[in-house]
Regions:
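Short aromatic-glycine-enriched beta-strand elements
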Residues: 42-53
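Short boundary/loop segments of OB/S1/cold-shock single-stranded nucleic-acid-binding domains
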Residues: 16-30
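Conserved hydrophobic positions within beta-strands
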Residues: 34-36
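Short, structured beta-strand/loop micro-motifs enriched in basic residues and often containing a Trp
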Residues: 66-74
């Protein structure tokens, strides 16, 4: 019984850590504009990879973490909502580390569609 309790405590801690927002600065929002290089419709989280032109004339790759495909599908997304080659302006909660990445907030595609994860309309 003691072994089972210890296992459940460790498992609960790992599950909680998995869903942590700790890597992201939730007090800030950064907006980037670029071209989608890859969209990963995978569990447990979806990912949008965006190539963003930088000041030096090169390109920075940004990794943007989203919700699970199941969650997004219930809000109208499909695995082709975002495609490589799409022009996109995307807002994120940036990584605290300063690396090029963040947690998805909203995005606007070239055709004017606004994508959110909440299912709520945006301005």
């Amino acid at each position: 019984m003691l072994t089972l309790c210890a296992f459940l405590i460790v498992a609960a801690g790992n599950a909680s850590a998995h869903h942590s927002f700790a890597p992201f600065d939730l007090t800030k929002e950064k907006t980037i504009t670029g071209t989608v290089s890859k969209f990963e419709w995978t569990n447990p989280h979806s990912w949008v990879w965006v190539d963003v032109p930088n000041e030096k004339g090169g390109v920075d790759s940004w990794a943007v973490e989203g919700m699970s495909p199941n969650y997004l599908a219930r809000r109208g997304w499909t695995k082709t909502t975002v495609k490589p080659g799409d022009k996109i302006t995307i807002s994120v909660r940036p990584l605290k580390s300063g690396e090029n990445g963040g947690m998805f907030v909203r995005a606007t595609l070239a055709d004017g569609r606004v994508l959110t994860q909440s299912g709520q309309p945006t301005d």
